[in-house]
Amino acid sequence: MLDTSIQALINKWQKYLVLQRNYSNHTVISYNNDLKHFLEFMNYYNSELVTINHIKTADIRLIRSWLAKRNCDNFTASSISRGLSAVKNFYRFLEKTTQLNSHIIFSIKSPKKTKLLPKALSEDDVVISLEHIEEYGNVKWVELRNKALLVLIYASGLRISEALSITKLHLQNLEFIRIIGKGSKERIIPWLPIAKNLITQYLEILPYKLGDNEPIFRGKQGKELQPSVFNRELIKLKHFYGLPQHLTAHSFRHSFASHLLEHGADLRSLQELLGHKSLSTTQNYTKTSIKHLEAVYTTAYPIKK
């Protein structure tokens, strides 16, 4: 439970993130959850309802205790780092809007993240997935929605959040999709006919009327489709066909990148298609491709000694 004055500050902070910093709704929700977790811990730590004075005077021992609790609760290094970033962001907002001076929290460094290589699916697993995803949905328009969405992600390398933001306006250009990705960075993705045709077929039987600016992928009740709902459909597919455990909507984006690289795409082009700010992020796919080639060599090369 939060003091009403603090909740009002949080509401202003959220509006600031959306309107002035152009943060996505997904990021704002994640940041809000992280901040509330921090404030709930502060409630417990101080044994009383948090006030603005508690927030302003929070010391390094409290903050490190909160980070340690997250670690004990099995949060990943990435989640802990994001949580600290969220709280720091809130404190920066307080610096701009209240009398808060530079706070000790800005001296705390984020934990080092373990670099995990992206896991792609084999081309065979992708084919199986695309052929059978329509079997899950119960009604025709949902089945077609699932296939159209999965083909779109694999054919374009979109993040699930980007794919779910597609509107009718995106369909008006016959050659490319203009995507606003992480950090409000714009990129141009070529339309593949198979993806656009499936989306057109899906919209023809969608039982809900949509405006040009509304996301086209809908849930069964007509609301915007959530990533978790689509991933549940993929879990059913994965279990029934014995597909890899790492199969998720995001794994098809990884597969898009890895398969293009294996078929001769250059890193700079791939960086543009994926919307990576840094080429070093894209270079992770070269490591997975090398591992794939090593595996092929080990199992198939006739001279192994």
Curated annotation (Swiss-Prot):
Xref: PROSITE patterns: CB (PS51900), TYR_RECOMBINASE (PS51898)
Signal peptide annotation: none
GO biological process: cell division; chromosome segregation; DNA transposition
Keywords for this protein: Cell cycle, Cell division, Chromosome partition, Cytoplasm, DNA integration, DNA recombination, DNA-binding
Subcellular location: Cytoplasm
Gene Ontology terms, MF aspect: DNA binding; tyrosine-based site-specific recombinase activity
Active site: 159, 182, 250, 253, 276, 285
GO cellular-component term (any): cytoplasm
Keyword RNA-binding assigned: no
Occurrences of domain Tyr recombinase (ranges): 116-298
Stored Pfam families: Phage_int_SAM_1, Phage_integrase
Family note: Belongs to the 'phage' integrase family. XerC subfamily.
Subunit structure: Forms a cyclic heterotetrameric complex composed of two molecules of XerC and two molecules of XerD.
Role this protein plays: Site-specific tyrosine recombinase, which acts by catalyzing the cutting and rejoining of the recombining DNA molecules. The XerC-XerD complex is essential to convert dimers of the bacterial chromosome into monomers to permit their segregation at cell division. It also contributes to the segregational stability of plasmids.
Entry protein name: Tyrosine recombinase XerC
Organism: Rickettsia peacockii (strain Rustic)
Gene: xerC
